[in-house]
Design a protein with these regions (language model features):
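A structural signal for multi-pass alpha-helical bundles of membrane permease subunits
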Residues: 21-34, 64, 114-124, 192-198, ...
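N-terminal, non-cleaved signal-anchor transmembrane helix
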Residues: 1-56, 60-63, 67, 248-262
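C-terminal transmembrane helix and the adjacent membrane-cytosol boundary/short C-terminal tail
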Residues: 2-11, 21, 150-161, 165, ...
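Transmembrane-helix boundary motif in ABC transporter permease subunits
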Residues: 1-5, 70-102, 115, 119, ...
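Membrane-interfacial helix termini and adjacent extracytoplasmic/periplasmic loops
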Residues: 37, 41, 46, 95, ...
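Transmembrane alpha-helices
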Residues: 11, 16-23, 114, 132, ...
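Hydrophobic alpha-helical transmembrane segments of multipass integral membrane proteins
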Residues: 59, 63, 67-79, 83, ...
Length: 262
């Protein structure tokens, strides 16, 4: 093994450690019987999980997060599919500008998007409501859905759709019988990935949620001015949920590629 390979592996290990070590520490301290995050641990306990599960505010925030994440996933995936299919099927003047605008939100700092959303929703009179969080998260996540589905469409054999047309199928019927089944793995991946992004998103939700707090916003309220071990427990649950959704999305893509290779 060359020195370059060793250096690259060491660098990769540092990156992985930098990302996941704080998460592991949070998981570890979520079972610590001491109130303060110190080593050595005072002992093993599930008290902090029992505390949050008995907290009605936690369950309300969890319900809000689940409603927002599931609604966002459906809307973002639907918009992403429509945009991806438009890019795949049609050519029109201004198409490059159209795609640039669609893919713009991930490149804008979240604080700017949050302030713009807050001002816009306040003007519409819907600031602080669940639909406003869903709308904001849809804007944030739709570009990811579009990218996933468009990548899948780039792999389709165009003769399949042409064969459907030759057999008398309308464009809508060809889409339902050819395009949608072909894109099903990407659509499934998009649903889980956008749900994970929405479930874990804090900055925009903090500005537009008002009294309808999501779990990340609820965590911020807990940590303000105090050290509360509940934060480690809630953070562990949020991370586990988000990672589960992401892993499911990756698995859908992986197994589809495996079946194609076979």
């Amino acid at each position: 093994m060359s020195r370059l390979d060793l250096a690259l592996r060491f660098y990769l290990a540092l990156i992985v450690g930098f990302i996941f070590l704080p998460i592991f520490v949070s998981l570890l301290f979520s079972f610590n019987s001491d109130r303060f995050p110190t080593l050595p641990l005072g002992g093993f306990t599930t008290h902090w999980y029992q505390t949050i599960f008995a907290d009605p505010d936690f369950w309300q925030a969890a319900r809000n997060s689940l409603v927002v994440a599931s609604s966002t996933a459906l809307l973002a995936t639907a918009l992403g599919f429509c945009t991806a299919y438009t890019d795949y099927r049609y050519s029109f003047r201004g198409k490059s500008l159209f795609l640039a605008i669609i893919l713009l939100p991930p490149t804008i700092p979240l604080i700017i998007i949050a302030l713009a959303m807050l001002a816009w929703f306040a003007r519409l009179g819907i600031s602080g409501q669940i639909p406003s969080i869903i709308a904001a998260h849809t804007v944030l996540t739709a570009p990811f859905a579009m990218a996933i589905i468009r990548l899948r469409l780039s792999q389709i054999d165009e003769s399949l759709e042409a064969a459907a047309w030759n057999l008398g199928a309308s464009e809508w019927r060809a889409m339902r019988s050819v395009i949608l089944p072909f894109c099903a793995p990407a659509i499934g991946s998009s649903l889980f990935l956008t749900a994970a992004v929405s479930f874990d998103e804090f900055t925009v939700a903090w500005f537009v949620s008002g009294l309808n707090k999501t779990l990340p916003v609820h965590v911020l309220e807990i940590v303000q001015g105090t050290i509360d071990p509940q934060v480690n427990a809630i953070g562990t649950l949020v991370f586990a949920t988000s990672m589960t959704l992401v892993l499911i999305a990756q698995a859908l893509i992986f197994f589809k590629l495996q079946r194609r290779a076979a």
